[in-house]
A protein has these predicted regions:
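Membrane-embedded alpha-helical bundles of multi-pass transporters/translocases
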Residues: 2-229
């Protein structure tokens, strides 16, 4: 190894040694590990859920509803939070952090309002929606799906707001919090299922998803509040 490094020109070797020890590279490595860990934990959670429930009508219904709610939250997050990031950075450079944070609070309130309106619309059209999404289900499974849509609305609100807070934190270079917070959803779900392992049902999945998203949101809020004046 030393013979290989000896063949590298001195300026390049010096640059590499400084780069490998830099805080920036260490931060990138940490974010990479956390992001990769999040994918692994999510896979383990899914495998644990499948092994626990096996072939189950409840699991079929939950996966359908959870997938739709996650898609709806991600779809709503594709608008305001994504356009917020460049506007926040530009305003912070031109007018200062206080003015930019004020805009961030206003934008977060608008995004929360849009999520609340979406939740209200879902409540009003849940019967028609499930009729189209779950047309192959029997009546019992359709009724369960309608109940799960309503019961997963806290997840919709918390998960949807996490996109806004994620953009806010990324704008302030809080990459570790952004990378680590998604771990809380699968970890909480697995924890709740372990507590109820003797009699697992769909209620554990709903509780785990709602609690995990709430914990994720609280972690982000804590990080944001610590940087506000």
């Amino acid at each position: 190894m030393s013979s290989i490094s000896a063949r590298i020109p001195a300026p390049l070797r010096s640059l590499l040694s400084r780069g490998l020890g830099s805080a920036l590279l260490s931060g990138l490595a940490g974010v990479f590990v956390l992001t990769l860990g999040g994918k692994v934990v999510s896979f383990v959670k899914d495998a644990f859920v499948v092994s626990t429930f096996g072939v189950s009508d409840q699991l079929d219904v939950f996966m359908l509803v959870f997938g739709f709610v996650t898609f709806a939250a991600s779809l709503l997050a594709g608008g305001l939070p994504e356009s917020f990031l460049p506007a926040y950075v530009e305003l912070k450079l031109q007018k200062g952090a206080r003015r930019a944070d004020r805009m961030a609070v206003q934008t977060s309130a608008c995004h929360l309002l849009s999520l609340l309106m979406a939740a209200l619309v879902l409540i009003m059209i849940v019967h028609m929606l499930i009729g189209h999404l779950a047309h192959g289900f029997d009546e019992t499974k359709k009724q369960l799906a309608q109940q799960l849509v309503v019961r997963l609305l806290p997840f919709l609100l918390c998960f949807g707001m996490s996109f806004q807070f994620s953009a806010w934190l990324r704008a302030n270079k809080k990459f570790f919090i952004v990378a680590a917070s998604p771990l809380l959803v699968p970890l909480t779900t697995v924890s709740v299922m372990l507590v109820t392992l003797r009699a697992p049902d769909v209620n554990a999945l709903v509780l785990g998803a709602n609690l995990g998203a709430a914990f994720q949101l609280c972690l982000m809020l804590s990080a944001i509040s610590s940087q506000l004046p």
